[in-house]
Amino acid sequence: PRPLVAASAPQVFVQFAHVAMHLSPERTVEVGAATVGIACTYEGRPGHYVLTMPMEGEFVVIGGREKFGEPKKIAETKFRIEGDRVNAQVIRHGIPFLELEGRIGGESDGPKKFTEHLFCYKAMPSCQPEKSTNGGFDGDVLLTQLNWERDYTSLRRLEEGKIILRESARDPLVDIPVKRILRMEYAEGASKTGGEVLCSVP
């Protein structure tokens, strides 16, 4: 959607994460999460337009939606490692609509320290849409940019990788064809997340 511009290659970013959120020295909350985005640019800056962010934990979902406009949904996630095999699933309404699996291989030649940019739209639906002069919203629709600063301690290839999409009326990712996997990796380390408002969208 404008003002984002589709990337020259139709590529999709899929991430599964098992996150330990250090809310205070005494309190750490662990959640599972996934992010799916489409490659795009904003004023020449590469990133991904976020299609969905299913994750565990109501407070995490509400906070991300209200602050950054992230399209988060409450979901069940499963992430397990057995030997050198990795399997991750996202489940909503009893359907494992997104699944990833692979075998942990050798060190990847990808970067361990970098910043990723993702784009979202933050908007407040109007309580009186029939009277709205702004397309059914109260106030401006804002394009936001998420800035994820990665600092990995380990980055390894995932061999024999698969991404499995299943039919779900509420989560229709299966409509996106998986033609080939360009790169799949297993990372350990830390991420510092933040964001900013880029512009109002008329």
What are these regions (language model features)?
Residues 1-20:
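N-terminal ordered "arm"
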Residues 1-5, 25, 37-39, 151:
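Intrinsically disordered, low-complexity boundary segments flanking structured domains
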Residues 4-6, 64, 69, 153, ...:
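Homeobox/homeodomain signature
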Residues 6-11, 51, 60-62, 155:
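N-terminal start-of-chain detector that recognizes signal peptides
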Residues 14-18, 30, 67-68, 142-144, ...:
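A short linear-motif detector with a strong N-terminal bias
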Residues 21-101:
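Aromatic- and glycine-enriched beta-alpha-beta binding-site module
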Residues 71-202:
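Interaction-surface and assembly-scaffold signal
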